[in-house]
Amino acid sequence: MNGEISRPPELISSRNPCKSFENAIHKAVEAELAELAKSDANGGGKSKVKGPWLPEQDEALTRLVKMCGPRNWNLISRGIPGRSGKSCRLRWCNQLDPILKRKPFSDEEEHMIMSAQAVLGNKWSVIAKLLPGRTDNAIKNHWNSNLRRKPAEQWKIPLLMSNTEIVYQLYPSMVRRISNASPKEHLPQEEETGVLSDDKMDDEAKEPPREQNSKTGVYRPVARMGAFSVCKPGYMAPCEGPLVQASRPDSLAGKFLQSLCYDPIIPSKCGHGCCNHQDSTTLSSSSVLGSEFVDYEEHSSAELDKELISISNDLNNTAWIRSGKEAEQSLKADDQFRREYAHSKFSGMVNNGVSSQMVRQDLRALS
């Protein structure tokens, strides 16, 4: 035997049990398909058959799905004459699957469909994940035939599932990610809205509105005359000569005077009536709210007017002197520029042989 040990065929076949099992399944499927192909010459799915499924076709589809599993529908369709892979898949998923519920929809399932449809809309494949044993096609047909045409009063039944529970069941990973996020990233909680019954609403409508005995805690300020007044004299300081230009409102001195004149003056007496005053009867007659709310005003004195006049005169003089210096500097700069320009031009013309008469004309034009 040249050193080779002979092994029995049983040991050789037992080395790959998975592969041998798959081969056995494929052989059984091929044999089943061959039998079905012999029974009908039009098999193989080439000539499509439209209409209801026959009991023999349902039995063959059930046997093939048990052997191959609910997958590879094109291979399964070869064993059912006249049926395509899509037709086999829809027949199994909607009718023949043993997991499906064939009883009518219960009230709990209807309420769940209504609440899920209010949140998700017409996403029937997503809604079907909430109802085990119900297909998306069955849910859609039940919604279009029964639930959508129900009167509006039946929608007031309390929903068995809230929106948050629906989202948690459909998207658990998203809910975990939100719960682990920081407080700033949390979504706002939805307010729970209850549905009132018709009897309760009628009782509340019959009851008269109750008066609010307790006052609210909102602060409401009371109107009164202020304790501070603003001094706005009706005349300005007289100015003479050229200083009138600097005493305009747009000038620096005018703005400074306005800021001094219109500053709020704090009176020596308050306006709440707690300070002593000479005649309360005369003051109460002029007040809007009575003697307790009196507005005291202090008039400007003569000394203050003299100080303001002196300040304005000093500012005007300073502004006038500054403007004169600026004008003198600008004139000097212009003269210097003319001299330099004339000198440079004269020297250039002499070098070029220009006549002295033309140079004099240019100097006269510049002067």
UniProtKB/Swiss-Prot annotation:
Residues 181-216 are annotated as: Disordered. It holds the Pfam family Myb_DNA-binding. It comes from the Eukaryota. Residues 45-100, 101-151 form the HTH myb-type domain. Signal peptide: none annotated. GO terms for biological process: pollen development; regulation of DNA-templated transcription. This is Transcription factor MYB25.
